[in-house]
Amino acid sequence: GLLWSNEYVKNRATVLLSNIERMGIRNAVVSSSHPEPLCDRLSGFFDKVLVDAPCSGEGMFLHDPGAVEAWSPEHVLSCAQRQGSILDSAAKAVAPEGILVYSTCTYAKEENEGVITAFLERHPEFILIDSGVTFGRASETLPQTRRIFPMDGGDGHFVAKLQKTTGESYGGEWFVPRRNQSDAVQKQGKELYHSLSKEKNCPTILEAGTYLYLLPEKLPDLTGLPILRAGVQFAVIKKNRLEPCHQFFTAAT
């Protein structure tokens, strides 16, 4: 499978990439894109999409004084509008019969039940299903959703799970490595991979600058997208030889 992690704010996306590397995730793409163009390109691609939406952060008041200072009724409404827009974009990227999960860390009904109710009115192709979360408590107005208050062991979290009943699957282009890949470097890369890995089949190796990357399978076309990383940073070219990168060993364990 493929894990695609996107964060629009660039410095947060850099932290996201660091976490992906630290956790040794091999099959990931990390991007820093506005949701709309990204989801337009990847329409119908994902079986599961999680929207951890930017919110007013009422659940963070105890831990973050800045969240208290930033709060206002207008901010709540602004967040709800932005959340609805993000959900509209994310809905495009969900494959038929796929799952869309929406979560926040705020108490505001405008950002939780209100956003989901309005989304369902705009998107009859989606249905609300049970969240599957067994702790916390059901919402009074949308019992399939879940609220997790501090007395439940959370920080005011909300989660809703939706399923797409109709639509078209991904029909876009698939990733093809550029033609200017060095045959000699490819050969060296495969030899290095087999000397370090017990796996029989070597993943697709992408040469980009002085680095080699091991790409995930079934990768869509990445042309023009703000990609921070696709796959695993495998090796670096130094003086006509390859040195394995730290991330490869992190991902191999």
Language-model regions, residue ranges each:
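Residue-level signal for inorganic ion chemistry
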Residues: L3, L16, V49, G98, ...
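Polybasic, low-complexity RNA-engagement segments
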Residues: D155-F158, T165-T253
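Mobile active-site "lid"/loop adjacent to the S-adenosyl-L-methionine
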Residues: N11, K48-I86, C105-N112
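S-adenosyl-L-methionine
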Residues: L2-G44
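Conserved Class I S-adenosyl-L-methionine
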Residues: E113-F135
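Helix-to-beta-strand junctions that scaffold the AdoMet/dcAdoMet cofactor pocket
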Residues: V94-P96
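Class I S-adenosyl-L-methionine
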Residues: L128-G153
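Local beta-strand N-terminus motif with an aromatic residue
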Residues: F45-D47, P124
